[in-house]
């Protein structure tokens, strides 16, 4: 909601950290690019939820769409997403529209407004618990996504270290 914190899931502090960490994150972006290169959505329209500045979004994947509607609550997200990806996408003729909106809260309406679009949740579902702070409600809302998105091409990516863990380590070959 404000420029510094953006509701605890973004803001100026986050974007400065993300910008400074680009090199360190590049192997993850490369793995995501390899995975997404195999994904073949049946549409040219993408609803990108939680886009932030697109720090984790491979440009080659974004370029596969003719239209992208990017949603984020962070007041800096649209400007920084355009800074990172806008020129490249414009050159390719991709129509990019940024929306400052809580897409999770209005997802059924957005799906009706964009009936042919596929949906990608970019580092947003794992943060839902920090915004809502009621674990039972979060679990209920995330479980409802299966019904809400039924019949729709959709996917999600999120880092593992966004919240408390049970202390187990990840398998090295994940």
What are these regions (language model features)?
Residues 1-43:
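Class I SAM-dependent methyltransferase Rossmann-like catalytic core
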Residues 42-54, 153-174:
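Conserved class I S-adenosyl-L-methionine
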Residues 52-65:
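Conserved SAM-binding loop of SAM-dependent methyltransferases across substrates and taxa
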Residues 74:
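Conserved SAM/SAH-binding beta-strand->alpha-helix loop
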Residues 112-114, 133-154:
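A short glycine-rich, Lys/Arg-flanked "PGG" loop and its adjoining helix->strand segment in the class I
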Residues 116-135:
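A short SAM/SAH-binding and catalytic strip from SAM-dependent methyltransferases
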């Amino acid at each position: 909601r404000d420029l510094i914190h953006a509701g605890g899931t973004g803001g100026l502090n986050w974007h400065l950290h993300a910008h400074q960490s680009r090199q360190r994150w590049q192997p993850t972006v490369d793995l995501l690019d390899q995975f997404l290169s195999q994904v073949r959505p049946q549409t040219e329209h993408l609803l990108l939820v939680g886009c932030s500045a697109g720090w984790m979004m491979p440009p080659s994947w974004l370029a596969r769409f003719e239209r992208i509607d990017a949603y984020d609550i962070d007041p800096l997200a649209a400007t920084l997403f355009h800074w990172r990806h806008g020129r490249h996408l414009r050159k390719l003729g991709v129509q990019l529209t940024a929306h400052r909106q809580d897409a999770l809260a209005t997802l059924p309406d957005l799906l009706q407004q964009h009936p042919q679009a596929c949906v990608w949740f970019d580092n947003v579902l794992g943060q839902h618990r920090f915004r809502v702070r009621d674990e039972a409600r979060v679990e209920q809302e995330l479980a409802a996504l299966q019904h809400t998105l039924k019949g729709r091409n959709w996917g999600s990516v999120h880092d593992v270290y966004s919240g408390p863990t049970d202390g187990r380590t990840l398998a090295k070959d994940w």
